[in-house]
Curated annotation (Swiss-Prot):
Keywords: ATP-binding, Cytoplasm, Ligase, Nucleotide-binding, tRNA processing
Protein name: tRNA(Ile)-lysidine synthase
Localization in the cell: Cytoplasm
SUPFAM superfamilies to which the protein is assigned, alphabetical: Adenine nucleotide alpha hydrolases-like (SSF52402)
Function: Ligates lysine onto the cytidine present at position 34 of the AUA codon-specific tRNA(Ile) that contains the anticodon CAU, in an ATP-dependent manner. Cytidine is converted to lysidine, thus changing the amino acid specificity of the tRNA from methionine to isoleucine.
Residue ranges that the Swiss-Prot or TrEMBL entry lists as coiled coil: none
The UniProt record lists the keyword rRNA processing: no
Reaction(s) catalysed (UniProt annotation): cytidine(34) in tRNA(Ile2) + L-lysine + ATP = lysidine(34) in tRNA(Ile2) + AMP + diphosphate + H(+)
Gene Ontology CC: cytoplasm
The keyword Nucleotide-binding is annotated on this UniProt entry: yes
Amino acid sequence: MKLIAVSGGPDSMLLLDVFKHHDIVVAHVNYNKRNSSKRDQKIVEDYCFKNNIKLEILNLTDYEVKGNFHDWARKKRFDFFKLVYEKYNCDEILLAHHKDDFVETFLIQKNQKRKPLYWSIKSKNFNFGMNINRPFIHKYWKNQILKILDNKQIFFGQDETNKENIYLRNKIRNNLLNKEFLKRLIYIKILFLNFFKLRKIKKIEQDFNKWKEQNFDKQNFLKSKFQENLITIFISEKTNNSINLSRGKIQQIIKFINSEKNEKKFILNKEFYLVKAKKIIKVLKK
C-alpha cells in the first residue's frame, strides 16, 4: 500500500488523481492557520469520498510555537505521516514535489551557503523511517500541473500566502515567476552538478558505511578526507533531516570532534546535541 500526502493544493491533487486506482491511503494535515484551510480539507475529503479512498486527517490548533513555524509544522506533519505509514503497513509515501520545487530548493541551498552531498531533492530516499518517492520531481513543471488539472476539471485549493514574500522559498518562487527559460537552465545545471558528483558520492557512502560499522568512532572519522560530508549524512540520519547545517556549523562540529579538550557536548539546536563518549560520536535528544 502507498501513502499519499495530500494538502488539497494543485500538486498533491494531481498526484492523488494519478494514483487513485492504486492501493492507497491519503494523509491530510490541516494547520487551521489560513482562512482557506477548511476549504482545502473539504476538497480532499470530497475527492476521497467520491473515489472510495481511505483518508486520515490531522487537525492542529496549537500554535504556541517557539522558533520557526515551518520547522515545527514539518515535524508534526512527518510524525503524523509515520503513524499512518505504520498503521497501514505502507511500503512508500508519495510526495508531490515537482521541477519548480527542485529548482527552488537548489537556490535555497545556495542562498544558505550549504554544500550538500546531493543538490536539491532526490526523487527517492529513506527518511523518518519511510521510503519516500517523488514521482513528479523530474516530470512536471508547475504550469504543466495547472494545465492538466484544468483539462481534467479537478478541484484544488491555492495557498494565498504563497504570493507573500514572508519566507525565503516564497521570495525565490515569486522572483522566478514567468522566467521559464531561466528555470530550465537552472534545472539542467543541477542535473549536471549532481552527475559529476556521482563518483565522489559513492566514495563518501563507502567511508560513511565504514564509519557506521565502527559505531561512529573518532579515529575512523579522522582518517576520512570527506569529513564535512560524513558530518552532513550523520546529523541528517540521526535527526531525521531536521537540522539545516551551514558550512560554518559543520566546521564547528569537526573542530569539536578533533578537539582534545574535555568538551562534553556540542549544541546542534533546541532538540539535539552532539557528545563524545569514550571516543564514540553520538547525537542525543535533550
